[in-house]
C-alpha cells in the first residue's frame, strides 16, 4: 500500500514551491517600493491572507511500508505521521530538495503537499540594501510596517533535539527563517554569493593556503580535462578560462574586507570545492559552521597548521585527528564537552589514503610522518603562559597537537550532521623549544603548504566518489528529521 493519493510528485512540489515563494517575494518587493516612493503602507488584510509568507512543505507517511530502508543516514521516517517545514530559496535548494523528496516518495509512498505557511518573509532578505538610499525615518518605517527578523523565532532547537512535539514533526533541521538568516550572514562574512558555495568544504587558518588554492584553481580552470570551470573569489572576482592573467586579476586586496573570505572552485554539476579562511579562533570556527550548515554540505575538512606536542614529531609532520579535547568552550551550552565527538571512518580513511597518494610514500613511511591522535582545541592563544596546567591536560588526554579551531569544527559537524575531519601540519613545537620565527616560518610553509593542500583536495576526490555512503548513521539522533 502507498499513500501518495492525490499528493504532488517531487517535481510538482518543487514547481509549486518556486511559484509560491516568487509570488511572495514579488509582492513584498513591490510593497517596499511603493512605501519608499509614495509612503503607501502594505495592506494589512492582504498580509493576514498570506501576502508575504514562505511556502510550507509537508510530507505524510501512513506507516504502511513493509521494508523501509534502514542503512542510509537520511531519507528515512522514524514514525508514521506528518512532517513539515517552511522553505526559502527553492531554486537554490532544488537539487537537494528533489533528492530528499524523491527518496521519501519512492521508498515510502509518501504524500507530498505544498501550501502557504503562516510565517512571513522578513523584508531584509528580499532587497539589496546597497541599492536603497534611506534616511533614518524611512529605515524605521520599514521595520515598523514590514515583516522583520525576530530572533525569538530563529534557533537550532531541531538540530539540537530540544524541540517540543506538536501535531507535525520537523521535516528538516532548519526552517526558512533560520536558513535566510544564515544565507545573509554567509554573504556578509565570506564576500561571495551563496549560490557559489560548493558541497565539499575546506577550512584553513592561514592565508598561504588560500594563495596555493587560487594558484592551483587557476591552473585547473585552464586545463580542458579538469572538471572545474570557474573560480569565484571573495570580493567579487569571477575567473574562467577566458580570463586574461587570472592570478593577477585576483591579486587585489578586496578579500580583506571580509572576516572569513571564501573561494569557490566550481564544477558544472555543482560538486566543486569551497575554501574558507576562517582565521584564528573557535569563535570564527563556530560562526562559519552555524551558517554553512544550512547549505547541507557533504563534508567539511580542517586543513591548517598546529603546534606539535610530542618530542618525536618534526616540523612539517601531519596530524590526523581521531579524537578532540574541547577546551574551546564556545559550544559548551549546546553540546557539553563530555559528549564524545566520534571520528568518521570514511573521512579518516580518505585523509590517510590521500596522504599516501600525494606524498608517493608507502604506508610505513607515511606513518613516520603522519601521527594519529587527540587534538586539543583551545580558546587561549597564550596557553603557553599556563605551562603547568596545560601540560597536565596534554598528558591526561594523550594529545599530539594543539590548535584553536579543529575541535569546534568537528563538534559543529557532529551537531549539524555534516561529515567532518581534520588533517593538520605541525608548524612549531612550543613544548620542545621549537617556536616559529619569521624567516623559519616562511621557509617551512613554502615547502609544506602545496603538499598539504593537495592532500585535502585529493581526500575530497575520494569522498566525492563515496556518494551517499559518505553520510554516516552515527550522526543521527533517535528522532531524526527525514531530510539530510
Swiss-Prot record:
Catalytic activity annotation: AMP + H2O = adenine + D-ribose 5-phosphate
Regulation: Allosterically activated by Mg-ATP. Inhibited by inorganic phosphate and formycin monophosphate.
Domain of life: Bacteria
EC category: hydrolase
Keyword vocabulary terms for this entry: Allosteric enzyme, Hydrolase
HAMAP family: AMP_nucleosidase
Subunit structure: Homohexamer. Trimer of dimers.
Extra facts: AMP nucleosidase binds AMP at the catalytic site, Mg-ATP at an allosteric regulatory site, and inorganic phosphate also at a regulatory site.
Protein name in the entry: AMP nucleosidase
Gene expressing this chain: amn
